[in-house]
Structures are given as C-alpha cells and as structure tokens.
C-alpha cells in the first residue's frame, strides 16, 4: 500500500511539473496575420491580400470576423494561433490590429506541433 501511494504521489508530481512547463505566461511580439491564408501563401501577411478566389480584397479582416484563426507571426518565423479572451467573439478585439506589430501576453503552449497563445492583453507597437 505504501509503495502504491508513493508511486501515485510521484506520478501526480511529475504531471503537475509537466503541465506548468508547457503552459507558461509569456509576452511575445510580432505581426497579427490571417493564419489560413498565411499557410497557403507566406506572402499573405497584410490586410490587403485578396480572397483565394481573387475577387474580394481585405481577406484578413473578413476571415477574422467570420471566426477564422488569427495568428502572431514572430520575427523568427514562428506562428502562434491566438486563442483566449482576445480571440473571443470572432476576433472582435483583434480585427483592427491585423497586420500591425503587437505584443501579446498570455499562456503559451504547444500541442501536436501547433503553438498557441491564450492572449489576455495586447499592446500595439506599430502599424
């Protein structure tokens, strides 16, 4: 019984430490982008790129307002999907900052090779 209890205690401790290591609060800076279009074409970082059909401008804002993922593209090329409070209500708090350089603060995690930031605050750096 003591060995079982000791084993469970160690397991719980290891899991607790692992969880903290994978979800750390950080402040990241970069450009807010339309994640779907960026994956299709790395040059689609501005708000003025057109829809894939080529018939509608301002794809980034249109897609973000429909709830498509917005991401933070850092200077080293990493892409963090923005989740959490700032991405709520179809990215309402992010749309006006698309293509701008910003700082986001929130819990950063990686799941299956996808980086996310559950952003709680945004600071505009430049347009």
What is each PLM-predicted segment?
Residues 13-23:
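Sec/Tat signal peptide C-region and signal peptidase I cleavage site
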């Amino acid at each position: 019984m003591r060995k079982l209890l000791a084993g469970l205690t160690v397991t719980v401790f290891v899991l607790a430490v692992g969880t903290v290591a994978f979800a750390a609060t950080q402040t990241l800076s970069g450009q807010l982008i339309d994640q779907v279009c960026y994956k299709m074409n790395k040059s689609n970082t501005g708000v003025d790129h057109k829809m894939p059909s080529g018939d509608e401008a301002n794809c980034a804002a249109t897609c973000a307002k429909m709830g498509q993922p917005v991401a933070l593209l850092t200077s080293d090329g990493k892409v963090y999907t923005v989740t959490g409070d700032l991405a709520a209500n179809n990215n309402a708090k992010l749309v006006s900052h698309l293509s701008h350089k910003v700082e986001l603060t929130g819990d950063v995690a990686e799941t299956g090779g996808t980086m996310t930031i559950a952003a709680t605050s945004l600071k505009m750096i430049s347009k």
